[in-house]
Structures are given as C-alpha cells and as structure tokens.
Swiss-Prot record:
GO MF annotation terms: triose-phosphate isomerase activity
GO BP annotation list: gluconeogenesis; glyceraldehyde-3-phosphate biosynthetic process; glycerol catabolic process; glycolytic process
Protein known as: L-erythrulose-1-phosphate isomerase
Gene3D superfamilies assigned to the protein according to its UniProt record, in alphabetical order: Aldolase class I
Annotated gene: lerI
Length: 261
C-alpha cells in the first residue's frame, strides 16, 4: 500500500489567469507529472472560471484542484455565491476558506469560516483554512490569541465523525503576504505553527497538517519545508508560472529526500 504524501505544496492564483492561461499551466503541470515526488501532495486553486477545465486536464494525475471560496448553504437566494454542491459538481477536491483578503474586504469572520468549514466537510471537500495575524497584532503581543481564536472559530462547528475528516490549516501572517509582503523568519513561522497545531489538536483530538504561506519563494522554500511544524507550503506569485511552481517543488523534494525530520 502506498503511503499518503507527508507534505502539501500548492498555489492559489487569486483573481489571475484567463481560461487559456489556466489551461496552459495545467497542461504543463500534467506533462511534468513524471517529476512528481511521492512525499509531496500537489494542489492548484484557480479562479472559479477555470476550475472545471483545470480539473479535467489534471484528472489523470495526483494533483488536487480546489476553489478559492464558497458559501455554507447548499443553494438559495445568495446572489454571486457558489455552493459546496456546485464545487462537488466540478469534481473539486479542496476549498480555500478564510483568506485574509476575504476577511478584510468581504466581511469574512471566524463565524462564517466555521460555517463554511462544516459545510465543506459535510460535502466531502477538504477545507484549507487560512489564518494569520496582522502586523499590529504581532507588535501588540496578541498573535497567539488571534491565531487561537481563528482556529477555534473555524473548527468549533464540527461534531462527531466530522472531526476525523481531512482538514488543512494554512498559516499566512497578513504582513507576509502580497507583493510587498515580508517573509516570516522560518523560526518564527515554525513557533507560530506549533501553537496553531496544538490549538487544533485540542479541538479535534488529533494533529492536522499546517502549511506555511507568506512570500514563499525559491530562495526560502527549502529552509521553510525543513521546519518540524511546517507540513507544506501555500505559495503565491512565485508559483503563478508553472516553471516557478516546478522549481519550488523540485527544491523541496530534494531537501526532503536528505532530511531526517
């Protein structure tokens, strides 16, 4: 029996790429499938307009494909929203929830992230729950408190067997993401992720993977993936072209093959 991948490394394209551009990326990734490493689970999160096409192109690979958001309701008068049923209809695997841009610009709260997490699990989607403190949170010494509130809020609506579902966390300090983001020092990220994992374990009764995201690039990916509490990387613009993504995958795979962690 083949062991499940230990690490998750993927990218969300945010509001980028036309259908043709998305298709080109997916085809290039498919054509490079022989380079995959069994220790790494790859995933891609395109915009809604491209998810079905990307999933179709990658259907014969191990790459998981996801959506960047969803509503918690199955259907109804929610103009402009997309339901978990619709994502399942596109054969998607993952749904990204609670990104800081959703929280800041679209009124996402710990409560709504919790509702969406429960709906995702109920419909067999893997929730990738984004959490992270702002610079002011960090400077005021409230980072651990804020992160704990976000983790508990996201997971507290799960009950019974739902707590055994596949769930991913992604620690993305708000000050580290975006074009002007400052990458977190690996030691800082690892310490925060240890705290996040401990909080989630108290809620769920088991350890779940926690990825790091925030200005991940080819220069820092190897040091980050070597940290004991970093279970993968959630990459932004450094992986928006397929060459960049494949480069980071290759560097991490090589590092892990020689790693004893």
């Amino acid at each position: 029996m083949t062991a499940s991948p230990r690490y998750w490394i993927g990218t969300s394209w945010k509001m980028n790429k036309t259908l043709a551009e998305a298709r080109g990326f997916a085809e290039a990734l498919r054509d490079a499938d022989a380079l995959r490493d069994p220790a790494i689970q790859r995933f891609i999160i395109p915009p809604f307009t491209a998810v079905r096409e990307v999933k179709s192109i990658l259907s014969d690979t191990s790459v998981k494909v996801g959506a960047q958001n969803m509503h918690w309701a199955d259907q109804g008068a929610w103009t402009g929203e997309v339901s978990p049923l619709m994502l399942r209809d596109c054969n998607l695997d993952i749904v990204e929830l609670g990104h800081s841009e959703r929280r800041e610009h679209f009124g996402e709260t710990n409560e709504t992230v919790g509702l969406k997490t429960e709906a995702a699990v109920r419909h067999g989607l893997i929730p990738l729950i984004c959490i992270g403190e702002t610079l002011s949170d960090r400077e005021s010494g409230r980072a651990a408190e804020i992160l704990s509130e976000q983790v508990v809020g996201a997971l507290s609506k799960l009950s019974g067997s739902q707590k055994q579902a596949q769930i991913l966390l992604a620690y993305e300090p708000v000050w580290a993401i975006g074009e002007k983001g400052i990458p977190a020092e690996p030691s800082y990220a690892d310490a925060r992720q240890a705290e996040i994992i401990a909080v989630a374990e108290k809620v769920l009764g088991r350890r779940i993977p926690c990825l790091y995201g925030g200005s991940v690039n080819p220069d820092n990916c190897e040091e980050l993936i070597s940290c004991p509490h970093i279970d993968g990387l959630f990459i932004g613009r450094s992986a928006w072209n397929v060459e960049g993504y494949l480069d980071i995958l290759a560097k991490c795979a090589a590092k892990l093959r020689g790693d004893t962690k």
